[in-house]
């Protein structure tokens, strides 16, 4: 098993969101390749400050949808409020404009969730 997935298991809450996150990451690691557009994701987020920022084993290529979902899941995987705020902010930034157009379109429910998370901090 990937060492960064092991760290996720030991650092994060043991809940369905962590299980879903790990499953997405494991599927991406085992996938041959993504046809078309992909985004590189840190399995163990940089904001955890536990290293691995430049380790290729901590990087995985995800589809845009998988990447956005993983960032939504990360917010629900941690109990520490400071870490939760960093992850919520990173997720919020993914919805911001990039090159003059929306990077991701989110539904009202996702918008409400992110705004509530950010308002707590």
Model-based region annotation:
Residues 1-30, 50-53, 57:
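Short, charged surface segments at domain edges that flank catalytic/cofactor-binding sites
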Residues 11, 27, 73, 94, ...:
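Residues that form generic nucleotide/phosphate-binding pockets
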Residues 28-62:
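Histidine-centered nuclease catalytic patch
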Residues 59-86:
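Short Cys/His-centered divalent metal-binding micro-motifs
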Residues 71-74, 92, 100, 107:
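Core of folded catalytic or high-affinity ligand/protein-binding domains
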Residues 79-99:
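N-terminal accessory alpha/beta regions
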Residues 96-121:
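Secondary-structure boundary/linker elements at domain or insertion junctions
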């Amino acid at each position: 098993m990937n060492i960064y997935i092991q760290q996720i298991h030991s650092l994060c809450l043991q809940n369905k969101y962590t299980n879903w996150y790990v499953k997405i990451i494991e599927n991406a690691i085992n996938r041959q390749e993504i046809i078309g557009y992909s985004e590189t994701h840190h399995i163990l987020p940089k904001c955890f400050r536990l290293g691995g920022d430049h380790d290729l084993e901590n990087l995985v290529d995800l589809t845009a949808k998988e990447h956005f979902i993983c960032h939504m899941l990360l917010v629900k995987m941690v109990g520490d409020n400071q870490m939760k705020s960093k992850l919520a902010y990173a997720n919020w930034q993914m919805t911001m404009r990039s090159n003059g157009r929306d990077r991701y379109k989110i539904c009202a429910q996702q918008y409400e969730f992110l705004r509530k998370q950010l308002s707590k901090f």
